């Protein structure tokens, strides 16, 4: 049943991975125990993330799920939005933020209560939010493609002010992470033409560089980033043959190293050092690059 594909994954704090399987629910996968079904759920979950001791999942039509016991039991609620929620992030002190179409949902008690922040309230035609990345007092907001307000914004949560970090007219910002405290790494995607890229920006001096595929081909879109122990992986959308790729990002060499291929879009990736799990549109793949690859059906 696991050739059906998955929509989200995160590495467990103990072992294995939590995986959102399309239209079926939340599972745990580990090499030792294989697959275990934890929570039956028809809603699509697009992001699973640890915030403090809790596991959160968010997805279509504002769905929010939360577990306090490593996925054994879950509570389910929803934000007042029909939008797909692609990202949830937070800190160990109880601060959590997720997004609606144009707004941010903020909690100070690990998601027990929420308030709404509107970083784009002054904009006549605001961009649709696609990704979030929390760093210090700033919440970086990545948008879907928007001619005027597309790109990456820095929202100061305390001051309720927003400023542009990077303008993007023709690309979405699908995923972001901060590496080594100073580098904002973003997975960018285009709709027409192969203009996908991984962009890297120094938050101290504004220096920026772009990494594109080192293979002969250019990618239309990069989708998801994951980092563990200094090792970064990035996924792509599927190509004309229906396959996408998983690359390792080498910031020093400013290059992408091709590691594996998966059928359909590579929706999400999570890694534990070099080993990674990719949640793809049609299949899931757990890869130990320096051992024999395991396809999961």
UniProtKB/Swiss-Prot annotation:
It comes from the Bacteria. This is Uncharacterized protein YkuO. It comes from Bacillus subtilis (strain 168). InterPro entries: WD40/YVTN_repeat-like_dom_sf. The lineage of its organism: Bacteria, Bacillati, Bacillota, Bacilli, Bacillales.
């Amino acid at each position: 049943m696991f050739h059906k594909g998955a929509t989200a994954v995160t590495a467990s704090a103990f072992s294995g991975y939590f995986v959102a399987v399309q239209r079926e629910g939340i599972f745990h996968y580990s090499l030792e125990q294989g697959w275990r079904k934890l929570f039956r759920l028809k809603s699509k979950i697009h992001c699973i993330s640890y915030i403090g001791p809790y596991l959160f999942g968010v997805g279509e039509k504002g769905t929010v799920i939360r577990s306090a016991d490593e996925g054994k039991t879950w509570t389910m609620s929803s934000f007042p939005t029909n939008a797909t929620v692609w990202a949830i992030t937070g800190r160990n002190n109880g601060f959590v933020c997720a997004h609606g179409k144009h707004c941010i949902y903020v909690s100070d008690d690990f998601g027990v209560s929420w308030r709404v922040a509107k970083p784009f309230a002054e904009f006549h035609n605001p961009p649709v939010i696609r990704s979030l990345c929390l760093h210090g007092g700033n919440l970086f907001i990545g948008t879907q493609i928007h001619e005027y307000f597309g790109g990456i914004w820095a929202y100061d949560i305390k001051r309720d002010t927003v400023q542009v970090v990077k303008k993007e007219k023709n690309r979405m910002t699908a995923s972001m992470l901060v590496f080594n405290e100073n580098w904002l790494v973003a997975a960018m995607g285009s709709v027409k033409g192969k203009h996908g890229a991984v962009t890297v920006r120094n938050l101290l001096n504004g220096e920026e560089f772009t990494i594109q595929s080192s293979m002969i081909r250019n990618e239309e879109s990069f989708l998801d980033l994951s980092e563990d122990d200094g090792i970064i992986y990035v996924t792509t959308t599927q190509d004309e043959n229906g396959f996408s790729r998983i690359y390792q990002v080498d910031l020093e060499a400013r290059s992408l190293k091709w590691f594996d291929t998966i059928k359909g879009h590579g929706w999400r990736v999570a890694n534990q050092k070099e080993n990674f799990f990719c949640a793809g549109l049609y299949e899931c793949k757990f890869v130990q690059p320096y051992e024999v690859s395991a396809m999961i059906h």
